[in-house]
Structures are given as structure tokens and as C-alpha cells.
């Protein structure tokens, strides 16, 4: 761990961001206090409320540079302040921090170009795309848009989601009802509660991460329509090239950090409004105000993403082929206990929203018949390893251990094994990845 220089930016500060925080602390913080820099004033204000509500301590906000704002907190409150940074994704990017540290001036104007490229993949109107500094920032904004409409209602989360998508609903509103398995009588009961208008919104991922399960989206959408409940769908794992969820959802959230970027060198998020939603006008108004006109994404990050998107379609198509190949290989391997992939798990539900030209995606999860051997298999795996997904190179992650280390028993009770290994399959020759897996699985 001492040799680890960086990690996922919401969990581990990038060296440039560390330097930015240190500089701000030196310039504006009193003795015994620290400064955390946020990209804009409203984020700092929300973080301030979160810290003061959680710890009942005094904090203050100071203007910093180029619209950034610093939240000054006691040393004892730094952990809680960084919880806000992690959960909400309202973060300063490494490029934004670097620009400040080097006194660089960056002109804007790239957001419209990026939206044009994205609109070609989603089918939505240009002005119905709203850009954020991270995928979680987009989810958090969508959640606050829901609270703006229904301030006293809980939300409903269907299927086991990405860790912080659930944390946001647990910590920043009225609570959440969580149904991790949308098959059987419990799902039928949840649908009835949706039809009765009990919830402020229904959240789900298509497919879920890391179990790659797909909820029956047409059925949920119909129940939401009957009950007057907004439906928020995250299509990050599948991408808008493989599935069309906008026909059912009121809002679609997407982490552009993943497959859209494909390189792992930029963070960004997006919320897309369904123009046919009965709340389209309210959502547009809220999101436009929240993004200061349509985009909060730092200009240089925007430019990098535009460049990365050039081979988006070709890359996703290749990952679809490789993902299916790897999933089939693992499914037939004698040492593998179970494989999660949209082709194998809830396949009917996935087909309901799959595009004619779409595939099953490049994300695969699996366990071993002898789970305790997974550490040896992981150590022997000659592939890149890390916590993200959607890169053009194959990336292996001991997902549960990284995302749910402090709640392993809870995750396992929800069907997510602590020994689960998640593969984000890249564009390499499929046989190269299979060869690496075969050698590693010799240790199983």
C-alpha cells in the first residue's frame, strides 16, 4: 500500500488535488483546520450542511479561484467532509486542480460539441443532456431533482446497485426501500406499491453492477406511469449503444467515465431527460439551474472526452464480442462456480430493452466452485487490475472486497459473494484474455 500513488479519484485524491487542498489549507485555513476545495459554490454549501448536520461542528466557506470554493473544517471533521466528496461525486478534477496550480487559463466552449456526439448515441434532444464532473454527481443531481418534486417520499431501489448509488439514497433524503432481487412475490408486491404512488422515484441500473441482472423495465415503467412515480435508470454498464432505456425512463443517468471514455483518463457524468416524461419541464428547469445552463464539466475534461469518444461505437462493438466470448468460456470452465452476464441472467428482461444492433456488453462477473482459491487466481491473473470498468483494455477487479469491504456480510446476504471477481473485457484479441484466464484458473 505504501507504493500506491493513486486510486479511484472519489476515494483517493489525485496528487494534483492533494496539492490543491494543501495549498488552500495553507492560504485560508486556521490552525487545526483543513480546507477541501469543491468545483462550485453550491457543492461547498451542500457539503457544509452535510458536515454540520452529521457532527454539529462549525465550518465556513471561502471563495477560492475560478469559481471553486473551499470548505474549511476542523481536523476532526475531515473524514465526514470527504464522505460527501466520495458519495456525491461533486469533485475537482485533476485537470482543474493542475490548471489552478500552474496559473493556467482555459477557455470554454466544448460542452456543445460533446453533447452533439452524445445525442447521436442516445436519440434525445441536444438540450436534454446535462453534463457533470462525475457519474455520481449526475446521479446525485437526479436524486435532488426527485426530492424537489417529492420532498417527503422515500425512493425504491430495484436490484443490487453500484455502492454509492444506494448510499446517496440512504444519506441525503428520506430513505430508501431496497429490493435486491426483482423476481417472485416480493417484486410483485413492490410493483403494487409503485402503482399506489408510495415512492418519490424508482431507481435501477441496466444491467446491475456487479450481478449484471436486468429488471423488467416495461413492467416497472407501466407501474410508475400508473402511480405517478418517476423512473430513473442508469445505463452505464450496458451503454446507450446496446440498450434503449430512454423509452421507459423519465431520467437516464450515465457515467461517461466508463465505456464512453474507454481510456480511464477522465471523469464525467450525464443526466438525460425523456422529453415525453410528464415531469420533463420540471426536470429540465432543475437540471439547467443545477448545471449553470447545461454543463458543469471542466473544459479540459470535456475536450479529452470528445477525443476519447471518436471510436466509441467500434470499441463497444468489439467489447460486446469479447465479453460474450469470455462469459461463454467461464460458463463452461470446470473450476468456475457461477457466471453473471446479461445473456445468462434475466435474459428475457434484457432482450426487452436491447437494441437490434446491440450486444450484451463487456462486463462479466464470476465465482469459483472453491471460493477460497479466488485470491490465488486473482494474483496469478496476467491482466490489468483496478476498480473501474469500461476501459479498452481488460480490467479485473475483486469487486466486493473493494466496494463493500466494511459490509461483506450484508453484501453476501444480497447475493454478492465476497469472492466475486468482475472482469471488464477490453478490445484485445479474445483468445489473449482467455489464455490469461486459463493460466490463472489452473490455480483453482
Segments the model singles out, each with a brief description of its role:
Residues 1-137, 158-171, 186-187:
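Conserved N-terminal alpha-helix of the aminotransferase class I/II PLP-enzyme fold
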Residues 1-62, 308, 324-395, 402-412:
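Conserved small-domain helix->loop->beta segment predominantly found in fold-type I
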Residues 38, 132, 181-184, 368, ...:
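Conserved aromatic
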Residues 121, 125-335, 340:
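Conserved PLP-enzyme active-site core in the AAT-like
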Residues 259-266, 301, 388-401:
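FAD-binding core of FAD-dependent oxidoreductases
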Residues 282-284, 375-382, 436-441:
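Short amphipathic alpha-helices in soluble, non-transmembrane regions
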Residues 427-438:
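Short, amphipathic alpha-helical "lid/cap" segments that border enzyme active or binding sites
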Amino acid at each position: 500500500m505504501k507504493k500506491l500513488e493513486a486510486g479511484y479519484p472519489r476515494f483517493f485524491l489525485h496528487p494534483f488535488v492533494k496539492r490543491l487542498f494543501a495549498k488552500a489549507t495553507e492560504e485560508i485555513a486556521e490552525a487545526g483546520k483543513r480546507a477541501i476545495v469543491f468545483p462550485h459554490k453550491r457543492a461547498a454549501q451542500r457539503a457544509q450542511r452535510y458536515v454540520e448536520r452529521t457532527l454539529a461542528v462549525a465550518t465556513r466557506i471561502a471563495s477560492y479561484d475560478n469559481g471553486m470554493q473551499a470548505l474549511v473544517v476542523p481536523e476532526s471533521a475531515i473524514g465526514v467532509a470527504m464522505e460527501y466528496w466520495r458519495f456525491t461525486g461533486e469533485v475537482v478534477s485533476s485537470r482543474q486542480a493542475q490548471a489552478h496550480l500552474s496559473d493556467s487559463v482555459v477557455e470554454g466552449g466544448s460542452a456543445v460539441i460533446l453533447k452533439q456526439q452524445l445525442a447521436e448515441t442516445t436519440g434525445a434532444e441536444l438540450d436534454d443532456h446535462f453534463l457533470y464532473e462525475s457519474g455520481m454527481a449526475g446521479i446525485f443531481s437526479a436524486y435532488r431533482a426527485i426530492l424537489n418534486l417529492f420532498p417527503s417520499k422515500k425512493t425504491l431501489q430495484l436490484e443490487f446497485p453500484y455502492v454509492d448509488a444506494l448510499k446517496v439514497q440512504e444519506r441525503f433524503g428520506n430513505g430508501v426501500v431496497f429490493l435486491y432481487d426483482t423476481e417472485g412475490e416480493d417484486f410483485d408486491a413492490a410493483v403494487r406499491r409503485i402503482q399506489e404512488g408510495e415512492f418519490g422515484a424508482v431507481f435501477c441500473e441496466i444491467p446491475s453492477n456487479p450481478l449484471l441482472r436486468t429488471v423488467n423495465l416495461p413492467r416497472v415503467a407501466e407501474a410508475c406511469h400508473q402511480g405517478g412515480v418517476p423512473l430513473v435508470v442508469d445505463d452505464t454498464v450496458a451503454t446507450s449503444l446496446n440498450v434503449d432505456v430512454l423509452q421507459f425512463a423519465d431520467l437516464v443517468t450515465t457515467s461517461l467515465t466508463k465505456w464512453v471514455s474507454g481510456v480511464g483518463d477522465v471523469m464525467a457524468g450525464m443526466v438525460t431527460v425523456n422529453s415525453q416524461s410528464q415531469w420533463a419541464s420540471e426536470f429540465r428547469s432543475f437540471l439547467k439551474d443545477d448545471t449553470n445552463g447545461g454543463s458543469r464539466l471542466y473544459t479540459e475534461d470535456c475536450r479529452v472526452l470528445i477525443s476519447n469518444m471518436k471510436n466509441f461505437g467500434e470499441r463497444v462493438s468489439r467489447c460486446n464480442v469479447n465479453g460474450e466470448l469470455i462469459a461463454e468460456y467461464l460458463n463452461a470452465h470446470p473450476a468456475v462456480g457461477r457466471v453473471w452476464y446479461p445473456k445468462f441472467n434475466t435474459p428475457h428482461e434484457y432482450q426487452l430493452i436491447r437494441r437490434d444492433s446491440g450486444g450484451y456488453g463487456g462486463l462479466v462477473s464470476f465465482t469459483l466452485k472453491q471460493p477460497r482459491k479466488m485470491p490465488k487466481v486473482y494474483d496469478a491473473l496476467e491482466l490489468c487490475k483496478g476498480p473501474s470498468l469500461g476501459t479498452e483494455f481488460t480490467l479485473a477487479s475483486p469487486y466486493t472486497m473493494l466496494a463493500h469491504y466494511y459490509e461483506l456480510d450484508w453484501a453476501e446476504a444480497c447475493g454478492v459473494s465476497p469472492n466475486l471477481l468482475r472482469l471488464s473485457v477490453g478490445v484485445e484479441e479474445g483468445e489473449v484474455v482467455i489464455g490469461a484466464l486459463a493460466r490463472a484458473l489452473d490455480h483453482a
